[in-house]
Amino acid sequence: MILPVFLYGQPVLRKEAEDVPKDYPDLKQLVANMFETMYNADGVGLAAPQVGLSIRLVVIDGDVMGDDFPECKGFKRALINPEFLERSEEEIAMEEGCLSLPGIHEKVSRSKTVRVRYWDENWEEHEEVVEGFAARIVQHECEHLTGHVFIDNVSAIRRQLNKGKLNSIIKGTVRCSYRAKAVGK
């Protein structure tokens, strides 16, 4: 089932997400719905707060980026209660976008490599080192779990230059090719 993507301005995007308990109802179905929602919106990642749920869950499928970024080939994961164990000091600045901020793309610096621990939808624990663009996707999506969005990482002047677009998103007057839920609509 395709879920609405909550847009910038929705309060759930600014909340610290809660850990997912092992007895969370219909977790596998939620993961499937989030993947379907992400694919429908042509995204490579989606966090639970973006579908209105303040829980620590993200889904990622970077495979579509595999031609340009080989580390993304086959990189499909559901990360439950993810935790960064290490982040490299070396950062790379690249342009990012977000399904919750349609039409906005800005350059953001992120760690080149991260070591992350998480559980999958079968409650199997994983710890892995993720590099390059795949690491960028993981960091971007996990940032949603802390009540932040990528625009928070750009300079005040860049945010000011995007103010009109941000207001359009909040009002719900921005055009979206996917099902979305704005504050003003």
From Swiss-Prot:
Positions that bind Fe cation: C98, H140, H144
Keywords: Hydrolase, Iron, Metal-binding, Protein biosynthesis
Highest taxon listed in the record's lineage: Bacteria
Keyword Cell cycle among UniProt keywords: no
Annotated signal peptide: none
Active-site residues, record numbering mapped to chain: E141
Protein's UniProt keywords contain Nucleotide-binding: no
GO biological process, any: co-translational protein modification
Pfam families, sorted: Pep_deformylase
CC cofactor note: Binds 1 Fe(2+) ion.
Molecular function as annotated in GO: metal ion binding; peptide deformylase activity
Cofactor section: Fe(2+)
EC number, as in UniProt: 3.5.1.88
Catalysed reaction, written as an equation: N-terminal N-formyl-L-methionyl-[peptide] + H2O = N-terminal L-methionyl-[peptide] + formate
Function: Removes the formyl group from the N-terminal Met of newly synthesized proteins. Requires at least a dipeptide for an efficient rate of reaction. N-terminal L-methionine is a prerequisite for activity but the enzyme has broad specificity at other positions.
Family membership noted in the UniProt record: Belongs to the polypeptide deformylase family.
Protein name: Peptide deformylase
